[in-house]
Amino acid sequence: MGYRSDVGLALSKAGAEQLREELRALNKNSETFSETTAFLNATDKHLKHEATGAELYLWSWLKWYEHYPDVRFMEDLMGKLESDDFLFLRIGEDMNDNEERGNFWDNPFELSILRTITSI
């Protein structure tokens, strides 16, 4: 069980390059490296915008717990990035649990939060 979230992360070219640099700096035998590479490979969607080098990562129904090594790595990465190099969006299970960080709003993926009411 546990609390689940949907997470989106848009990275500018510089942000994506820093992600790769931070991964290369990890000990390849560490839990953080194995958990983070598995996490990045298990996205629901990963897109690269060829013209700009920006990248998009989307995960759904994810446990975003800061004590998990992969989440800690991503949190640390966002703490190091310039705010214009990333946009992090998280929607939790609770209606009022939305999180936005970073200023990469002019990303080529138009990443945003949208809550709607629908019917049949």
Where are these regions (language model features)?
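Charged interaction segments
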Residues: 24-120
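Short, extreme N-terminal segment that most often corresponds to the first beta-strand
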Residues: 1-25
